[in-house]
């Protein structure tokens, strides 16, 4: 790793560092759950493998394929990309527009957006099928943690937009 890449890391021992690495951990946890649930839904679109076949009639979909794709892409791969961006801070041309608009790192913006999307996903889930499984409560706590850590002043400061040179 180059010296400039090392300088982009926030020290673990600092309060900001612990909050930032906590955000990264919460995103990885979200990704693991999204990949697990999404792959299970795609493997068995009836939902029986997850014990969710009884709620399928309550949903506006014929099977769990579409929710499975959503979970894999939005709640699986996207949080991994955001966590990578927060940890490594790559400078990619395609992320410059997001950084200009938000004034923060694209990865921070993605983490905040994922926390909001997860909150909406859980609200819709709660409306349609209720909160029946413990993992829904764990996921709700994770959504709150992602939002709280992303909005923490130190994390926001650490993720401020860097001038590209």
Regions found by a protein language model. Give the residues of each.
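Topology signature of small-to-medium multi-pass alpha-helical membrane proteins
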Residues: 2-165
